[in-house]
From Swiss-Prot:
Protein name: Phosphatidylglycerol--prolipoprotein diacylglyceryl transferase
Residues engaged in binding a 1,2-diacyl-sn-glycero-3-phospho-(1'-sn-glycerol): R139
UniProt-annotated location(s): Cell inner membrane
PANTHER family hit by this protein: PHOSPHATIDYLGLYCEROL--PROLIPOPROTEIN DIACYLGLYCERYL TRANSFERASE (PTHR30589:SF0), PROLIPOPROTEIN DIACYLGLYCERYL TRANSFERASE (PTHR30589)
Lineage: Bacteria, Pseudomonadati, Pseudomonadota, Gammaproteobacteria, Legionellales
Recorded GO CC terms: plasma membrane
Pathway membership, UniProt: Protein modification; lipoprotein biosynthesis (diacylglyceryl transfer)
Similarity comment: Belongs to the Lgt family.
Pfam families found in the cross-reference section: LGT (PF01790)
Coiled-coil region list: none
Length: 261
């Protein structure tokens, strides 16, 4: 059994301003995405400029933050949102949803593609390899905050988290760091290193993230305000990941069936 290391969630202070590790992880994620995008843009076959990369990161960040927060309120805290809609803007209280962020990024990349006269599917194929390392950084932020812990376990690496009772739990944030962050990055970066059929990279991302998240949810404690949403075992995260698996699998088949490259 391991004990949570009790990391101070505040990274440093600038006078009265507290800079939290979780916020820094978002900055790290965006910085890594920007760097990877600039690296990929150096390939003349991809037809991207540094200016377009900078604009894309801005659009992506906007969609992620707005969609992530709105998605959390709608998917995970709807009753509180209806009772007090202003909680949407209380971001300091925490609460971000990957699936909401995904929808937000879909919308903003579509707007970006319209303004730059690029095909939306080409834009998403360029974007998705940049995402997993940002997800990895976010899960490290969750771990530092001591939140989103796992279910009670007897495995040797079970960890006692503050505010989660005396029993050891799966460090599910680290499982998601490895699955949705490291492993997903390796798979998507390798797959996207060569030009693939249009939307194949995006489809594989949807499929793999959905599978990895669905698996990780078996070790993660369900949100207390929701519990299991169906069958006595299905969580909201699994419910939202199922469409990703189905759509991703079908879209990957479609991409290779209708090759445009």
């Amino acid at each position: 059994m391991l004990y949570y290391p009790h990391i101070d969630p505040v990274a440093f202070r600038l006078g009265p301003l507290k800079v939290h590790w979780y916020g820094l992880m978002y900055l790290v994620g965006f910085a890594m995405a920007w760097g990877l995008a600039l690296y990929r843009a150096r390939d003349p076959k991809r037809h991207w400029t540094a200016q377009q990369v900078g604009d894309l990161i801005f659009y992506g960040a906007l969609g992620l933050i707005i969609g992530g927060r709105l998605g959390y309120m709608l998917f995970y805290d709807f009753s509180n949102f209806i009772a007090n809609p202003l909680t949407l803007f209380q971001v300091w209280r925490g609460g971000m949803s990957f699936h909401g962020g995904l929808i937000g990024v879909i919308v903003t990349t579509w707007i970006f593609s319209r303004r730059t006269h690029k095909r939306w599917m080409d834009v998403t194929d360029f974007v998705v390899p940049l995402v997993p390392l940002g997800l990895a950084a976010g899960r490290i932020g969750n771990f530092i905050n001591g939140e989103l812990w796992g279910r009670v376990t007897t495995v040797p690496w079970g960890m006692v988290f503050p505010n989660a009772g005396p029993l050891p739990r799966h460090p599910s944030q680290l499982y998601e760091f490895l699955l949705e962050g490291v492993l997903l990055f390796i798979v998507i970066w390798w797959f996207s290193a060569k030009l693939r059929p249009r939307f194949a990279v995006s489809s594989l991302f949807l499929l793999c993230y959905g599978l990895f998240r669905f698996t990780a949810e078996f070790f993660r404690q369900p949100d207390p305000q929701l519990g299991f949403v169906a069958f006595g075992w299905l969580t909201r995260g699994q419910e939202l990941s199922l469409p990703m698996i189905i759509i991703g699998g079908f879209a990957l088949w479609w991409a290779y069936r209708h090759k445009e490259r």
